[in-house]
């Protein structure tokens, strides 16, 4: 059947004025130079396949005959039914549209793809497309209203819509020194809001070649005529395609404007380009010392029972949990058990010292909050706490503060922190981490400790984002905190000795953070999507944010698995009253400074 003369997939004589009068040899020469001939040959082969009884759809056959190959991750994230918008970056302009359709139709047949006026000329796509004109100015905008109405109807009927929100192929950016998507159109965000559709982000690797990028700089209006030419290049590479998890309407509704939603969706797509890494333990397993043997429960219990009554800070009867505050000298056996459980807990998340027990030179002069399960007779968790003025007035001065080894504090900040309690080395043992009462009870213990010492109204310390998180995830969390959670005034008063220089997003992604990621709930969704095991934002980080914590600086602790440490400061005088009541009780009144230095 290949000898049958067929209608071309894209006919040059229809695309140019007076094309029907051009000689055939000139048309063929031009079509070969523009890449249209390869499309037409592929179209003939598609028709041959259909004539031979093939049931494959146009997109699948187009990818087959144009040699478009891709490596796909996350196909299971496309919902099998219900209104859904799949948004993607647009690196190629044509081949990515064909692969886009092929991928989506592996899951569902009710697919429409929004294309520009150039792809409208690809006849095989017409049954699947909704056309918009991204180059036509005001007249095109009016004509595009028809396309907008089609999109709304399609989604309201419960179908799947594929969209490249940039509307045109990615081009070279002098600002970013790389090829990036054009601005994403906000009208797609408006449609998503009106229809209540779920959104699935997708990302294609690669970009068009030097010739196309040069045209984009010097004659952007004509570059679409050369998109087909790029397919010849695209058939020589393996494209990496990654699909993110669906974003439900309630999450999308957190954004307040179409611009914010557009930036959020673009960020979700672009973050999929960062490669996942194979995690390696902070300390090689062969180099780790065996964990020391735990102290018998009866000995620990006897030590707990010997503490003065005023050491008890919190009691949760239903969960069988008590929280005590004690000096290290009061609990020598419990201190050893704390060191053992610290090492076990931190190793489980890719941290840990690699030693048999995790104790250091700071433990003896700090106090320790201990959470004990009275029924299981086990240590459940602990927090190391230090009253800064007491430590500073001791023999080691400010060097007795744990974080002085990682951050350079100005004299001004040291003076402020005399009214603060340094907190750190927090853990809840693995067996109790899924018990919601565990963290709450530990923080109730902190609250009662503050009630006993209302003169300390600052809490500060580092919150860790371990190397078990992907580098891209840690970079995203870092960027979010830097944009939305900094105390700009006090951040000038402290510098990390080992700042996180390698944890950076691409510049165009960084620009999306201020508007596209304004809420910690949006960050939480993205972290869960980027992490292969679906883990969320570190629990302690969320807890500090709930208390109104502000970040001061960031550093890397190479001795603790390359952990990213964020130095956080909480002013209890400014913490939300409902949270203070929950953890500290209704009678807690922190004593403020005469002039608070933490307004920022």
Name each region found by the language model:
Residues 361-370, 535-536, 561-566, 578:
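A short helix-loop-beta-strand connector motif used in the catalytic cores of GNAT acetyltransferases and
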Residues 311-368, 372-375, 380-384:
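Short amphipathic alpha-helix that is part of the acyltransferase structural core
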Residues 343, 353-356, 390-550, 555-565, ...:
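Acyl-donor binding region in acyl/amide transferases
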Residues 10-12, 141-293, 511:
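Non-catalytic C-terminal accessory region of glycerolipid acyltransferases
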Residues 108-115, 366, 372-400:
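Carboxylate/His-rich catalytic cores and anion/metal-binding grooves
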Residues 286-329:
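Conserved N-terminal entry element of GNAT/NAT acetyltransferase domains
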Residues 1-87, 97-99, 106-108, 126-127:
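Membrane-anchoring hydrophobic helices of lipid-metabolizing enzymes
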Residues 124, 131-152, 156-162, 166-195, ...:
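Glycine- and acidic-residue-rich phosphate-binding/metal-coordinating active-site segment common to enzymes
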């Amino acid at each position: 059947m290949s000898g049958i003369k067929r209608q071309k997939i894209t006919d040059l004589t229809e695309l140019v004025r007076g094309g029907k009068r051009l000689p055939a040899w000139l048309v063929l020469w031009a079509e070969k130079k523009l890449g249209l001939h390869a499309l037409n040959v592929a179209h003939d082969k598609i028709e041959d396949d259909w004539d031979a009884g093939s049931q494959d759809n146009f997109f699948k056959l187009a990818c087959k005959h144009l040699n478009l190959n891709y490596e796909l991750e996350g196909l299971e994230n496309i919902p099998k039914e219900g209104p859904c918008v799949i948004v993607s970056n647009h690196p190629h302009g044509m081949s990515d549209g064909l692969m886009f359709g092929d991928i989506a139709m592996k899951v569902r047949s009710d697919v429409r793809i929004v294309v520009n006026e150039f792809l409208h000329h690809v006849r095989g796509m017409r049954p699947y497309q909704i056309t918009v004109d991204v180059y036509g100015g005001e007249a095109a905008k009016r004509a595009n209203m028809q396309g907008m109405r089609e999109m709304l109807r399609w989604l309201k009927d419960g179908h799947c819509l594929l969209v490249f929100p940039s509307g045109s192929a990615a081009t070279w950016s002098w600002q970013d020194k790389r090829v990036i998507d054009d601005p994403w159109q906000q009208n797609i965000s408006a449609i998503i809001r009106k229809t209540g559709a779920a959104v699935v982000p997708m990302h294609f690797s690669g970009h068009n070649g030097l010739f196309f990028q040069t045209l984009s700089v010097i004659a952007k209006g004509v570059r679409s005529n050369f998109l087909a030419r790029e397919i010849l290049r695209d058939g020589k590479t393996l494209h990496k395609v990654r699909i993110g998890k669906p974003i439900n309407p309630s999450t999308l509704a957190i954004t307040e404007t179409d611009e914010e939603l557009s930036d959020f969706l673009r960020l979700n797509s672009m973050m999929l380009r960062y490669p996942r890494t194979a995690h390696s333990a902070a300390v090689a397993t062969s180099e780790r010392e065996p964990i020391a043997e735990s102290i018998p429960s009866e000995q620990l219990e006897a030590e707990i029972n010997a503490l003065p009554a005023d050491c008890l800070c919190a009691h949760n009867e239903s969960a069988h949990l008590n929280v005590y505050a004690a000096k290290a000298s009061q609990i020598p056996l419990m201190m050893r058990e704390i060191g053992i459980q610290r090492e076990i807990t931190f190793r489980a998340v890719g941290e840990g010292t690699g030693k048999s027990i995790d104790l250091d030179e700071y433990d003896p002069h700090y106090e320790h909050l201990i959470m004990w399960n009275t029924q299981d007779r086990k240590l459940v968790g602990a927090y190391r706490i230090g009253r800064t003025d007491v430590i500073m007035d001791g023999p080691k001065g400010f060097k007795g503060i744990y974080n002085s080894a990682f951050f350079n504090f100005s004299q001004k900040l040291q003076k402020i922190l005399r009214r603060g309690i340094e907190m750190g080395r927090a853990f809840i043992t693995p067996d109790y981490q899924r018990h919601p009462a565990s963290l709450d009870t530990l923080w109730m213990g902190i609250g009662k400790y503050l009630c006993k010492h209302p003169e300390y109204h600052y809490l500060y310390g580092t919150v860790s984002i371990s190397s078990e998180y992907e580098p891209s995830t840690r970079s995203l969390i870092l960027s979010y905190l830097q944009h939305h959670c900094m105390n700009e005034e006090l951040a000038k008063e402290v510098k990390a000795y080992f700042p996180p220089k390698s944890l950076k997003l691409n510049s165009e992604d960084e620009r999306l953070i201020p508007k596209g990621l304004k809420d910690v709930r949006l960050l939480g969704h993205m972290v869960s999507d980027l992490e292969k095991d679906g883990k969320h934002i570190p629990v302690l980080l969320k807890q500090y944010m709930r208390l109104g914590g502000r970040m001061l600086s960031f550093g890397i602790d190479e001795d603790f698995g390359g952990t990213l440490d964020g130095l956080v400061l909480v002013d209890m005088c400014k913490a939300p009253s409902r949270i203070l009541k929950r953890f500290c009780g209704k009678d807690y009144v922190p004593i403020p400074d005469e002039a608070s230095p933490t307004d920022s």
